[in-house]
Amino acid sequence: MRYISTRGQAPSLSFEDVLLTGLASDGGLYVPETLPQFSHQEIASWSRLNYADLAHKILLPFVEEDISSSELKTMVDETYASFNHKAVAPLIQLGHNEWVLELFHGPTLAFKDFALQLLGRLMDNALIKRDKHLVIMGATSGDTGSAAIEGCKHSNRVQMFILHPHERVSEVQRRQMTTLLGDNIHNIAVRGNF
């Protein structure tokens, strides 16, 4: 599958190229050139899958030109095994026709863990294949920083610099961002806000 810029002026790229590039050269966002089609029967057959198996089925068409099914399965399984509920995202019934999807069972208790924990593994996989290293600089005033840090803290291919506004994040968020151990993680408090 190829990915194209929303502004239409950048070359199309593969999944791994997009993963390691970020924004398109024309300032746009990369989106799939086409969307995979799943039959009703196929979707119905997924209804009893666990979270990791479902994620694998949905993600595979988007990445299969760069990542084998078995590689993706390993990354997805390892990612969601670190969540603290066996269902990963349990659907809890509160009452008649009242349900809540719990999205706080990841390592940082933020819904962003669902994407950012897997993203770290996908990036590491691409960097290892290409024998490359990457520097990521991010700025956050919330839980994105801790989820991104947690997703990349074990990588020996990524150096991550996370900026957060000094005394403008909650104490829990500050501690999550500044106490995670990783030689590749650099957290910087910046006076002011952004």
Where are these regions (language model features)?
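PLP-dependent amino-acid enzyme catalytic core
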Residues: 1-194
